Design a protein with these regions (language model features):
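Conserved alpha-helical scaffold segments that buttress catalytic/binding sites
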Residues: 2-249
Length: 249
């Protein structure tokens, strides 16, 4: 572990993708989740609605619940003055891609030389088939921007290994619970909803977390599209009504 000196300054980041907090099996992810890169909320909501309107996939999605024990550990961490200052800068968005500029902004403001990231996430976000910066490869871009000065730990969902096959490099990064970072101190906080990877019926839990963060930290910026839960029921009803109308013609 690198020791900070007058010539080194490490920016410590807690990155939270709320898709981590899903209690979900691999089959449901593979058959019921929209996938896609950085879909806007409006588009991913329409895609999700198709799965909720279909009885077979709706039944699978209804089995997706929240990892309450892990979420409670996160709440405890966020409330602790030992882990976060009240003045901690916070950014809350839909896509994880926005963390890239957020990190660069505070690397400059803190005059930091090193970056230490704990990523709580269902996905590793190191690489995909896209060379351009996106929600699924932002970590590799940060790593390339700060070669030999970037340290990453990944708290992975229990289903992550089943879905995405850890190689040895990824396996070395993995921590199995938020409990493992209970003594960490962080400089900045990032949270994303990842609309194409979070089952919308769990949005209420995300919004409860936003409320906690907003009360705890005054320096918080929240993207408009994630300030309220997605209205899946309205679109599902429209799909069903359109189908009934079509069948009666």
């Amino acid at each position: 572990m690198k020791i900070e000196t007058q010539s080194t300054r490490s920016l410590k980041i807690l990155s939270i993708d709320f898709d981590y907090f899903q209690n979900v099996d691999a089959d449901t992810i593979r058959s019921c989740y929209p996938d896609g890169i950085d879909l806007p909320t409006e588009l991913s909501t329409i895609v999700w609605s198709g799965y909720y309107a279909n009885e077979r996939t709706r039944n699978k999605l209804s089995s997706v619940t929240i990892l309450n024990d892990e979420l409670n550990l996160l709440r405890k961490l966020l409330k602790s003055k030992d882990n976060f200052r009240v003045s901690t800068p916070v950014l809350i968005t839909n896509s994880h891609v926005h963390i890239y500029d957020f990190i660069h902004k505070y690397m400059d403001e803190y005059d930091a030389t090193d970056v230490n990231i704990v990523n709580i996430d269902m996905h590793h976000d190191f690489f995909n088939k896209n060379k351009e910066l996106d929600c699924g490869n932002w970590l590799s871009h940060i790593y390339n921007d700060y070669p030999n000065h970037c340290n990453v730990s990944w708290i992975a969902n229990p289903v992550s290994n089943i879905c995405y096959d850890f190689d040895q490099t990824l396996n070395n990064l993995v921590k199995n619970s938020i409990q493992s970072i209970k003594d960490f101190k962080f400089d900045i906080l990032f949270l994303c909803r990842s609309d194409n990877w979070l089952a919308p019926h769990l949005d209420c839990h995300f919004n409860d977390l936003i409320k906690l963060i907003s009360l705890r930290f005054p320096n918080v910026c929240i993207e408009k599209s994630v300030q309220k839960p997605r209205d899946i029921n309205c679109i599902v009803n429209n799909i069903r009504n359109a189908y009934l109308t079509q069948s009666q013609l």
